[in-house]
Amino acid sequence: MVFAHLNLLRKIVGIIGNFIALCLFLSPTPTFVRIVKKKSVEEYSPIPYLATLINCLVWVLYGLPTVHPDSTLVITINGTGILIEIVFLTIFFVYCGRQKQRLIISAVIAAETAFIAILAVLVLTLQHTTEKRTMSVGIVCCVFNVMMYASPLSVMKMVIKTKSVEFMPFWLSVAGFLNAGVWTIYALMPFDPFMAIPNGIGCLFGLAQLILYGAYYKSTKRIMAERENQPGYVGLSSAIARTGSEKTANTNQEPNNV
């Protein structure tokens, strides 16, 4: 009876975790809307999205019935995450504007795909029980899950240096913290160290980001206001409008050679 109730509670927490994880995957959407509008990635980094992609790939492998049975919720949300990250990285690739950065993104995605393919072949052919496969893939999941939660460290360093959270999306930090918290609870029913350890660490990283956001939110507004009030500052929309006007004027001044 107790086991049945615990199993039901675990499923409920897992469904909540799936919803929050979906919010986590979608939380950078305003960032990418901004990128598309400005046609530039500015100072945003592709690292969090590359880290999330490899994390989703290894968790899909972990959730396969031949690796870790009864993990449908793990497969569905991480499969969805893969599709979302591919869309985000495609947008980043189009608007990054630097060929070197595009090559790096392409190389990392190719390396991640090759790694998962090799890992899947080795685990499924060399290990013949789900317990051994769970152990092997679970360790890899731990590593990449921690990497995903730690990926904003470079952004956090920039926040401390510039005293501005402009390029650290708030909702991404909130969703990351909540996602790690819910999946930590899920991993305790029953205890799954491969989910509990990285998500517990993820809670700490998410909390650190929220503390930074609270500490530098006011200074960010002040810095942005000062920048916009500088005599030489021209907003993107103004610059585009001015460029268009200049082109029209130049066209009208050209002699008709027809």
Curated annotation (Swiss-Prot):
Chain ranges of the MtN3/slv domain: 12-100, 136-221
Which residues are listed as membrane-spanning? 12-32, 47-67, 74-94, 103-123, 135-155, 167-187, 194-214
Keyword terms of this UniProt record: Cell membrane, Membrane, Repeat, Sugar transport, Transmembrane, Transmembrane helix, Transport
Induction (UniProt): Induced by the pathogenic bacteria P.syringae pv. tomato.
Q: Name one GO molecular function term.
A: sugar transmembrane transporter activity
| Assembly and binders | Forms heterooligomers with SWEET8, SWEET11, SWEET13, SWEET16 and SWEET17.
| PANTHER family hit by this protein | BIDIRECTIONAL SUGAR TRANSPORTER SWEET6-RELATED (PTHR10791:SF130), RAG1-ACTIVATING PROTEIN 1 (PTHR10791)
Q: What does this protein do?
A: Mediates both low-affinity uptake and efflux of sugar across the plasma membrane.
**Name of the featured protein:** Bidirectional sugar transporter SWEET7
Q: Which gene encodes it?
A: SWEET7
